[in-house]
Amino acid sequence: MRRTVITGFGIISSIGNNKEEVLASLKAGKSGIEVVPEFVEMNMRSHVAGTIKLNPSEHIDRKVFRFMGDAAAYAYLSMREAIEDAGLTEDQVSNDRTGLVIGAGTGSAHNQLVACDAVRGPRGVKAIGPYAVTKTMASSVSACLATPYKIRGVNYSMSSACATSAHCIGHAVELIQLGKQDVVFAGGAEELSWECATEFDAMGAVSTKYNETPEKASRAYDANRDGFVIAGGGAVVVVEELEHALARGAKIYAEIVGYGATSDGYDMVAPSGEGAERCMKQAMATVDTPIDYINVHGTSTPVGDVKELGAIKNVFGDKIPAISSTKSMTGHSLGAAGAHEAIYTLLMLDNDFIAPSINIETLDEAAEGCNIVTETKENAGLQTVMSNSFGFGGTNATLIFKRYNG
């Protein structure tokens, strides 16, 4: 079977606008969560989010940007960094053997609402303009990359709630294994807007107790957690066939040695835990080395965190690897989360450290003995690492990366 490796990546997240900034934040245990004035103005109960600290319109050509909502713009900037990081030429990007699978967990609620409000005015439908469709269509994040980057291989979006971009990466692996592509840009993006956030607020899923101390709001495994913190951003990884990467002398961050994808078949929003267990086992079926670290899904919800820990205990028994939740720093970027956390995990593997789970002041009893890392651990001896991503509808994804030693 054709082997797949990661040869580059790019990222826009609440803790940095490129891989160097993100690496520094991960090592420092730095939070990217802030109060969002719009959330306050709209009388939301939750005022906090993992915010993006850049204006994408300042970094993208106007003729390209006009088709984009924020999610597509974040993905575009992430892909630009990924291409540079991987050292790919224009010909290597634009050919029949190079494709693109990028997804989002939601559509652009902001741009949809802008269009709906505009049509109520005196100009009617003429006020909407010609770009609303490309900003709001479900495949916006792939379409708005494939055209400017002249992609000629596969080009589509996948969506599976908060597991979206992890599934995109796993699907990229399978496309290469099947021989359909040699290189696939894979990942996801999500806009951060009050229009989207208010829906999660309405269902009681997000944190409301830490509006005065936003940096402490995301606290996976702390006994006083009260919901996740929504975030935005984008992330793209370059998934490449091993021999293709070696032939062009590419830097190899890791080999993708395991991928699992399962469904709970249990509840629309509450995880079963059993589905996550099967997902990890499925991913581990092709792995011949011990797992040294797990970047858990760990969203800071009272139920979800415990269910995932239960699944980990069932899979690993008394040999639980070191675990941490990077969402404690970043918040939860929904459709971008899987790719965000794949990159966080790859940075840890490449630089041999484990980023901490921050804000654990009183450890939940269910997390006792679970080897949760709460301080940055240098010289961690990482060889094989796992990243979990789960979503509403009972969808699950697990990715396993291994240091490539030739």
UniProtKB/Swiss-Prot annotation:
Catalytic activity entry: a fatty acyl-[ACP] + malonyl-[ACP] + H(+) = a 3-oxoacyl-[ACP] + holo-[ACP] + CO2; (3Z)-decenoyl-[ACP] + malonyl-[ACP] + H(+) = 3-oxo-(5Z)-dodecenoyl-[ACP] + holo-[ACP] + CO2
Chief location bin: cytoplasm
All residue ranges annotated as the Ketosynthase family 3 (KS3) domain in the record: 1-403
GO MF annotation list: 3-oxoacyl-[acyl-carrier-protein] synthase activity
Alphabetical list of SMART domains matching this protein: PKS_KS
Subunit and partners: Homodimer.
Family membership: Belongs to the thiolase-like superfamily. Beta-ketoacyl-ACP synthases family.
PANTHER family: 3-OXOACYL-[ACYL-CARRIER-PROTEIN] SYNTHASE 1, POLYKETIDE SYNTHASE-RELATED
Protein name: 3-oxoacyl-[acyl-carrier-protein] synthase 1
Organism: Haemophilus influenzae (strain ATCC 51907 / DSM 11121 / KW20 / Rd)
Gene: fabB
